[in-house]
Design a protein with these regions (language model features):
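Metal-dependent amide/peptide-bond hydrolase catalytic core
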Residues: 255-444
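Sec/Tat signal peptide C-region and signal peptidase I cleavage site
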Residues: 19-23
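Positively charged n-region of N-terminal signal peptides that target proteins for export
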Residues: 1-6
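Divalent metal-coordination and catalytic microenvironments
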Residues: 46, 94, 106, 145, ...
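Bacterial N-terminal signal peptides
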Residues: 7-18
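Acidic/His- and Gly-rich active-site-bordering loop/insert found
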Residues: 24-141, 150-167
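Histidine/acidic-residue-rich, glycine-tolerant segments that coordinate divalent metal ions
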Residues: 91-92, 128-140, 146-147, 158-281, ...
Length: 444
């Protein structure tokens, strides 16, 4: 009798699936279209009113208010920066409980960049604000965090509307200071996994101009790199520019160090292991005819594996110190190397979570619009949510932003003064993908 009933149930389910389930219940994508108009206006507001890392109070206040209106239990502000960062953290945590089941954390970041927008959009940013040095700078959303915040809210609204389709808990995170690598750790330091439910999964999206609007990219395993910011002070002995023999020139020494650093990856790292060392800034001297006492270098170092990361940093220190010694720099004037400026750990997308999610996304968006992509040497502190003792599986998908048919070689990239997403298509796809992902993880 049990076999018979099971057979009937299976037949009934097959019949429903074959003859009208989707007709009775609109797809997530169709439902997302209904929210796109209101979300578009919100996106334009966020884009036109960007705020730098540590100063996201207006963005987070708006997000908190909108999440509260959607029925979430909102706590704001949340976050605790380290003692040396003397700023209030404006993080947002919003919870929607809907019976028994898993907990899914959905994160979006909110901060912008100190850049002058040149897109010419009618809603382009003309914002200016003081940065952490006190200097007033132009501010722009050049990394898509305005889109991340908009999509986060759209998915939150959708999940509230679709409570009859899922069971469990949704934790929405509005995160600060991603561009400085400290926002995720600030939330965790303030008890994110103690004061609120520990997630069984954590998911996020990041805009990607290498993909067209309407497309989603995914990368199982290592997806984004360790990011180390290193400051080096090359110290010499200052003198008159007409009498260089009376000093030790830190400008020439810096040039030698920079050239030598080009061998760190090519001669110290296994060729099949990714690694990047870039000198992004060099500053020294005040006048044509003065050999300065010191020159300052700023480096960024990228890797995936911890063993490679350590070898890169050790090689930088060895080359820098010994190049100075070879130039006759005395022991008390050897270079000062600060490797703890900023660090963001590599992001590892849980392969099982990725595989599970990708099938759902292909069903919702079409197989041709869900594309496996290569790992990136960019960095993202979303990785921090999976690095605690709870070992939460995480997945950050990539959200296409480029106009259909545009040339990938000439599209403005992230952190470009010309970058902007195609708004409607990006919003709809982002909300669809995130909502479908969470529904799949919490499906009744």
């Amino acid at each position: 009798m049990r076999v018979f009933k099971t057979g009937l149930l299976a037949f009934a389910l097959l019949a429903i699936s074959s003859f009208g389930l989707h007709a009775a219940q609109p797809s997530v994508q169709k439902m997302a279209e209904k929210h796109t108009g209101s979300l578009l206006e919100l996106y334009k507001h966020f884009h036109a009113n960007p705020e730098l890392s540590y100063f996201e109070q207006n963005t987070s206040a708006r997000l908190a208010d909108e999440l509260s209106k959607a029925g979430y239990e909102v706590t704001y502000p949340v976050g605790k920066y380290p003692a040396h960062i003397d700023y209030k953290c404006w993080g947002v945590v919003a919870v929607l409980k809907n019976g028994d089941g898993p907990t899914v954390l959905v994160r979006g970041d909110m901060d912008a960049l100190p850049m002058t927008e040149k897109t010419g959009l009618p809603y382009a940013s003309s914002a200016r604000m003081a940065d952490i040095s006190g200097e007033t700078v132009d501010v722009m959303h050049a990394c898509g965090h305005d889109m991340h915040t908009t999509v986060l809210l759209g998915a939150a609204r959708m999940l509230a509307d679709l409570k009859n389709q899922w069971s469990g808990t949704v934790v929405i995170i509005g995160q600060t200071a991603e561009e400085r690598g400290g926002g995720a750790t600030a939330l965790l330091a303030d008890g994110l996994y103690e004061r609120w439910p520990v997630p069984d999964y954590a998911v996020a999206e990041h805009t990607d101009p290498s993909l067209e609007a309407g497309q989603i990219g995914y990368c199982p395993g290592w997806a984004m790199a360790n990011v180390d910011m290193i400051d080096i002070t090359i110290r010499g002995v200052g003198s008159h520019g007409a009498r260089p023999h009376q000093g030790i020139d830190p400008v020439v020494l810096s040039a030698q160090v920079i050239n030598a650093l080009q061998t760190v990856v090519s001669r110290n790292i296994n060729p099949i292991e990714p690694g990047v060392v870039t000198v992004g800034s060099i500053h020294g001297g005040t006048k044509h005819n003065i050999i300065p006492d010191e020159v300052k270098l700023q480096l960024t170092v990228r890797s995936y594996k911890e063993t490679v990361r350590k070898k890169l940093i050790d090689s930088i220190e060895r080359i820098t110190i010994n190049t100075a010694r070879a130039a006759g720099v005395p022991q008390d004037r050897l270079p000062v190397i600060n490797g703890g400026v900023e660090y963001t750990p590599a992001l590892y997308n849980n392969p099982e979570l990725v595989a599970n999610t990708v099938e759902v996304l292909k069903s919702e968006l079409g197989e041709q619009n869900v594309i496996e992509i290569m790992p990136s040497t960019g960095g993202e502190d979303f990785s921090e949510y999976g690095r605690t003792t709870h070992k939460v599986p995480i997945f950050m998908m990539r959200l296409g932003t480029a106009p259909a048919g545009s040339d990938p070689e000439t599209r403005p990239g992230l952190h470009s003064t010309l970058f902007y997403p195609v708004p409607e298509a990006t919003i709809k796809t982002g909300v669809t993908a995130m909502t479908a992902t969470v529904l799949n993880l919490l499906r009744k």
